Design a protein with these regions (language model features):
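Conserved N-terminal/central alpha/beta ligand/cofactor-binding core
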Residues: 160-272, 387, 394, 432, ...
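Glycine-rich FAD pyrophosphate-binding loop
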Residues: 147-167
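Helical element adjacent to the flavin cofactor pocket in flavoenzyme catalytic cores
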Residues: 251-308, 346, 352
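Glycine-rich loop(s) and the adjacent beta-strand/alpha-helix scaffold that form part
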Residues: 298-301, 305-370, 374, 595-598, ...
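Active-site- and interface-proximal helix/loop "cap" or "latch" segments in soluble metabolic
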Residues: 26-117
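A glycine-rich dinucleotide-binding beta-alpha-beta segment and adjacent secondary-structure elements
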Residues: 281, 289, 487-490, 501-586
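N-terminal Rossmann-like FAD-binding beta1-loop-alpha1 element of flavoenzymes
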Residues: 126-154
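An anion/pyrophosphate-binding glycine-rich loop and adjacent beta-alpha core
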Residues: 346-348, 355-494
């Protein structure tokens, strides 16, 4: 929590509490909109003081907003005011907690005054390369530009380096030294194979030049990381069952640790990062070249940065409801959005003539919105049991669960949610400790798979604790994400479909399982495991998980942003999730593409922008672009 002690002292000095003291402890609750949905804060007031505070927001990103909520509540109690400092990297969640806490306390008759913000002086700064957004791609862009001789300024709206990259696990690359060490000359695939795979997945609609550049340069990004003391290692096997027969291309790293090393190198190379500073408008000269940006600082003062090249690395638009509705349609109201930015970086580029690229979402798994579950959904939502839509009808080959992107997209096509149904016999089998495992693979094998005799994780889940499973269904029932139905009629009522349709689906599916042959969607015989026959029936509702959003502007292979005629906009570059063309229609299901492209595009854009800045010849007059 940034400057917590100092900032809180200032707040307390100016905060005044009004209202009569309470004679006994009372609880009050209020809600406010956070990052992914509503955040509810419950406060306990005793003798006119804040005795306790709790916050809950099931749609907040666990690693960011989820982690911030208890910190904020602790600060509210410790400092006896809702107006505490926000937590770095979780501004929207922080503001929601503060707003909801203030509203809850107002119910108790307690009101507070915010500390007056003293506006600082406006500033003008000059540099060769300006990087807007210091997430994963912005970090490598800034460092690469500096290492290529540019004077670099980075502006970041939070105080956290790396953004959502802090939650990333690994990246795609082919032809690395790490693969050479493992495979020697028998790698099994090459750049040609992976380029064709990317293009085939996009039905040849992808940006071929950009994809080719990425496939060829990703290995150099891995080496770049290694050269900067970042621990990168080749995964022992593919992350999901669907990719077990492919060359291992997933290169893991240590989550937040890489950005500790990145910060050291940014400091060594003189990169000037302006924290809590948000770019609001790009500047152009009379010829249309982008020559800087106007930014707003936390205290309301203005920072104007004059630059010879600008790289926009502001991340996805998942926090922008209008853009997300454009990408998802009516499914927006059903999906679980895990994280993302507000799309302001894209809007700034559109304002200077950037062509609008395809807007996509990163569909990555399906699960309930309920939290604090122990074991149930590891199986009900992660194995190839029976899945149905809101009409009670089967809609996919459940083998798609071997890849989170594929089955998540299938569920999105059903409106963003779907249901699984298993019977008591299946649960009994899953909980039978006389067996070594549950008998069915789970696609998150590397998280939940049991340890085999060789000490490695397997694709199978260990038998579950039935009591824990039942406790989970109590939670699911309470939150509306599940039910234990004694009859098919009850199951149909929960789903909202006709009993006849659901019963026909179940009867047909049971026939496929018993025959060992799926005549509808051709699920493999070895995965036709669980009939649905005798109640009680365990029904789980799962929502499409959206990790973020992809795209917004088109670029060439140099990461130069282009206009509607595919002509580069002078001195403007974009990286990472701002860029369209790597995925088309749906997030590409090649492991590590997101982080791999973020880091690689940043590294390349930084080098290209630095080179361009050396030949930059500014026009005498600098003006703001007017649409």
């Amino acid at each position: 929590m940034k400057n917590m002690k100092t900032a809180l002292s200032a707040v307390l000095a100016s905060a005044m509490i009004f209202g009569a003291a309470m004679a006994s402890a009372e609880t009050y609750s209020a809600s406010a909109k956070g990052f992914g949905g509503d955040v509810t804060v419950t406060v306990t007031v005793e003798d006119g003081k804040i005795a306790a505070a709790e916050a809950a927001g099931i749609s907040e990103t666990p690693a960011l907003g989820g982690a911030a909520m208890p910190q904020l509540c602790e600060a509210i109690v410790a400092n006896q005011t809702p107006y505490v400092d926000t937590v770095s990297g979780a501004t929207l969640t922080s503001n929601a907690v503060i707003e909801a806490a203030a509203a809850a306390l107002a119910q108790a008759g307690l009101t507070f005054e915010k500390a007056e913000v003293v506006k600082g002086e406006d500033e003008v700064a000059d540099c060769d390369v300006l990087v807007i957004g210091m997430g994963a791609s912005g970090t490598t862009a800034a460092l690469s530009a500096a290492e290529n001789g540019a004077k670099v300024i980075g502006v970041e709206s939070s105080t956290t380096l790396g953004g959502m990259g802090n939650a990333a696990q690994g990246m795609f690359a082919i032809g690395t030294t790490l693969q050479q060490e493992r495979y020697g000359d028998d790698l099994g695939s090459d750049e040609e194979y992976w380029f064709n795979k990317y293009m085939e997945q996009s039905n040849e609609l992808g940006n071929a030049a950009l994809i080719r550049t990425f496939v060829g340069e990703a290995k150099n990004t891995v080496q770049y990381l290694l050269d900067h003391d970042i621990n990168v290692y080749l995964s022992k096997t593919a992350q999901q069952v669907a990719h077990f027969d492919e060359t291992i291309i997933y290169h893991r790293w240590n989550n937040t640790q890489p950005f500790v090393h990145f910060q050291e190198y940014l400091d060594k190379n003189g990169v000037d990062i302006r924290w809590n500073t948000t770019a609001t408008q790009l500047l152009t000269d009379e010829a249309g070249a982008v020559v800087g940006a106007v930014c707003t600082r936390e205290d309301g003062s203005q920072l104007t940065v004059n630059a010879k090249a600008v790289i926009v690395s502001t991340g996805s638009f998942a926090g922008n409801e209008s853009m997300m509705r454009e990408a998802l349609g009516t499914a927006y109201d059903n999906v679980s959005i895990m994280g993302g930015c507000d799309g302001s970086g894209l809007e700034m580029m559109y304002a200077v003539g950037a062509a609008k690229g395809e807007l996509l979402t990163m569909n990555h798994g399906v699960g309930p919105k309920s939290r604090d579950l122990e074991v149930a959904t590891e199986l009900t939502m992660n194995t190839p049991c029976l899945w149905v839509n809101n009409q009670g009808k089967r809609f996919m080959n459940e083998d798609l669960l071997k890849d989170t992107v594929e089955y998540s997209s299938a569920v999105l096509a059903q409106g963003g949610y779907a249901y699984t149904i298993v019977d008591q016999a299946t649960v009994d089998r899953w909980a039978d400790a006389s067996y070594e495992n549950t008998g069915s693979w789970i696609h998150y094998w590397d998280q939940n798979g049991i340890i085999g005799e060789d000490g490695e994780r397997t694709i199978y889940h260990a038998p579950i604790d039935k009591d824990a499973f039942l406790r989970d269904f109590e939670t699911l029932t309470a939150t509306g994400d599940g039910i234990v139905a004694n009859t098919i009629e009850e199951a149909a009522a929960f789903i909202g479909c006709s009993v006849e349709d659901l019963q026909n689906t179940i009867d047909t599916y049971n026939g496929y399982v018993k025959a060992g042959k799926d005549d509808q969607f051709f699920k493999s015989a070895e995965d036709l495991l669980w009939t649905v026959e005798e109640g009680p029936f365990y029904v789980t509702k799962g929502y499409n998980a959206v990790l973020g959003a992809l795209g917004g502007v088109n670029t060439n292979e140099l990461l130069q942003v282009v206009d509607s005629t595919n002509t580069p906009i002078s001195s403007l570059y974009a990286t990472g999730n701002n860029v369209s063309g790597m995925s088309v229609a749906a997030y590409v299901n090649i492991e590590g593409t997101g982080l791999g492209f973020a880091l690689t595009s940043g590294r390349l854009a930084g080098a290209n922008a630095a080179a361009a800045s050396k030949s930059f010849r500014p026009l005498p007059k600098v003006v703001r672009f007017k649409a």
